[in-house]
């Protein structure tokens, strides 16, 4: 069940305030945080369901029961894990007292995994765990709509995931 389905059910039950409070508790404990949708209109940002981002991938792997080899063999699971690791790296930076903010972006079927805004700089980040197709319609649509300072492909044919994680996030904002 995706977070928007869960939110819809809880809205029917009148528990959105409770859900928001639980998300705050999980974020305060350093476990999970909600990423808001990136938009030019701040009011519309608050009206969308957050994308849940784990802050430590051990939360995912501990409950999976998969060995490292099994996890890598399951392309879908590995893709979620790699995206979550990159997201955790970004979210931990954005939540560390910096002025940086982390979002996701989606418009119809087009999406960008992460949008990092630091001051006047905006970095669009797409994560791929395997070989990525050369076309990234979400990145192209985002670039057309928002003119980011930088667009970054992590994994696939872009920056290797291990290299991305080795550098502080400021490296990717300023270089």
Label each residue range with its predicted role.
Residues 149-155:
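Short, hydrophobic beta-strand segments that form beta-sheet elements in well-ordered domains
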Residues 2-119:
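Accessory nucleic acid-recognition modules appended to NTPase machines
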Residues 95-96, 141-149:
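Arginine/glycine-rich "motif VI" loop of SF2 helicases in the C-terminal RecA-like domain
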Residues 34, 54, 104, 126, ...:
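Structural signal for conserved beta-strand scaffold positions within catalytic alpha/beta enzyme cores
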Residues 62, 134, 160-164:
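Switch/connector loops and helix/strand junctions flanking conserved nucleotide-binding motifs
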Residues 122-131:
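Active-site ExK catalytic segment of metal-dependent nucleases
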Residues 158-175:
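Domain-level recognition of nuclease-like catalytic cores that cleave nucleotide substrates
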Residues 131-139:
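Active-site-adjacent loop/helix micro-motif of nuclease/hydrolase catalytic cores
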